Curated annotation (Swiss-Prot):
It is found in: Cytoplasm. GO terms for molecular function: aspartate 1-decarboxylase activity. This is Aspartate 1-decarboxylase. Binds 1 pyruvoyl group covalently per subunit. Substrate binds at residues 57, 73-75. Belongs to the PanD family. Heterooctamer of four alpha and four beta subunits. Pathway: Cofactor biosynthesis; (R)-pantothenate biosynthesis; beta-alanine from L-aspartate: step 1/1. The lineage of its organism: Bacteria, Pseudomonadati, Pseudomonadota, Gammaproteobacteria, Lysobacterales.
Length: 126
């Protein structure tokens, strides 16, 4: 059996552009792609924290260090500039691989620069 686990996440990034007439995708600062291990043209899930929208598209590389987080094409209809989003990618793996797998979690500041990284999420307490 194979499991689908969170491979990488960019947490609470700010949408910088919404380009309806650009070829569909999400353009992500190249430094964030490198930090997460998300590959160009890889499928990603977008969860808009601001409005609750959830959809998928594919990642393309934006200029390194630019802070760009641009939703393009049809995806642009689901967000507005200034919205907070989570970008997530998943990977399929065996149960044995899953036992030792750790996701790349990247947390950003208001300018979409990396504030810190982690490989686990703290346990939620009551």
């Amino acid at each position: 059996m194979h499991l689908s686990l969170l491979k990488a996440k960019i947490h609470r990034a700010t949408v910088t552009h919404s380009e309806l007439n650009y070829e569909g995708s999400i353009a992500i600062d190249g430094l964030l792609l490198e930090a997460t291990g998300i590959r160009e043209f890889e499928q990603v899930h977008i969860w808009d924290v601001t409005n609750g929208a959830r959809f998928s598209t594919y990642a393309i590389r934006a200029e390194d260090g630019s802070g760009i987080m641009s939703l393009n094409g049809g995806a642009a209809r689901h967000v507005q500039v200034g919205d907070l989003i989570i970008v997530a990618a998943f990977a399929s793996m065996s149960e044995d691989e899953a036992k030792t797998f750790k996701p790349n979690l990247v947390y950003v500041n208001a300018h979409n620069a990396i504030s810190h990284t982690n490989h686990s999420i703290p346990t939620q307490a009551a």
